[in-house]
Amino acid sequence: MLDNTRLRIAMQKSGRLSDESRELLARCGIKINLQQQRLIAFAENMPIDILRVRDDDIPGLVMDGVVDLGIIGENVLEEELLTRRAQGEDPRYKTLRRLDFGGCRLSLAMSVDDEYSGPQCLQNSRIATSYPHLLKKYLDEQRVSFKSCLLNGSVEVAPRAGLADAICDLVSTGATLEANGLREVEVIYRSKACLIQRDGEMPANKQLLIDKLMTRIQGVIQARESKYIMLHAPSERLEEIITLLPGAERPTVLPLAGDKSRVAMHMVSSETLFWETMEKLKALGASSILVLPIEKMME
């Protein structure tokens, strides 16, 4: 039986978000032995229990107060929210933050042989999907009537099997659609993983742990988005070089032995367009440019 004084976190047991959720917790310093068949794991160094469940069970576990936190795709969360509202419920939860993984899109797709001129051409079509409420919300906004064909897997085979005229399914690269003779025609929802919390006041010990976890998650995400840069540069070009580096604070500047015209610069910067940035740095006279990954970061 689980100890109610420990923080309970639900995450996907296997699937699209499982590995990255596990990596996030590990990089936050939570030591957990996640053996393949165990559905409950206990942190060795913090009062945290991990429940490994199906992804579509996670929103309900949080909304019903069974667990304190959940790592879940926004698409699954929104579908559960719409489902419960359609049943007359008033589901409550808090979104603590969007995470930097699990990106995908929910899209309409049709046969490569069919013409598509916009959502209106789907009027009265039969559409196969695992996300009936998200699909209905979108097509209601477009004032398009349709017939839903609910499938919980292998949605992409529905048109060839004669079950549907089109599909609404998750797309990452589009390779699965192409393999089944389909093409993406409309994106109706963009999703990433997010961290959610149950509604209601949290006991002080759990809230303290959540605050600590949030600080660490922020540090992990910032570290993944940033790089530590070291370079040599002409002293008179310092300000131009600093301007080139997005997100950089004022750098550490050190003299170079035996060369008063140049300095060493150390700084943290985002990696956005960094190959282009490196070429511009070189054009300004920078040399010995090193870009290093950052494991942990805290402001």
From Swiss-Prot:
The keyword Metal-binding applies. One of its GO terms (molecular function) is ATP binding. One of its GO terms (cellular component) is cytoplasm. Its cofactor is Mg(2+). Gene3D superfamilies: 3.30.70.120, Periplasmic binding protein-like II. GO terms for biological process: L-histidine biosynthetic process. Equilibrium between an active dimeric form, an inactive hexameric form and higher aggregates. Interconversion between the various forms is largely reversible and is influenced by the natural substrates and inhibitors of the enzyme. Belongs to the ATP phosphoribosyltransferase family. Long subfamily. Catalyzes the condensation of ATP and 5-phosphoribose 1-diphosphate to form N'-(5'-phosphoribosyl)-ATP (PR-ATP). Has a crucial role in the pathway because the rate of histidine biosynthesis seems to be controlled primarily by regulation of HisG enzymatic activity. This is ATP phosphoribosyltransferase. The gene is hisG.
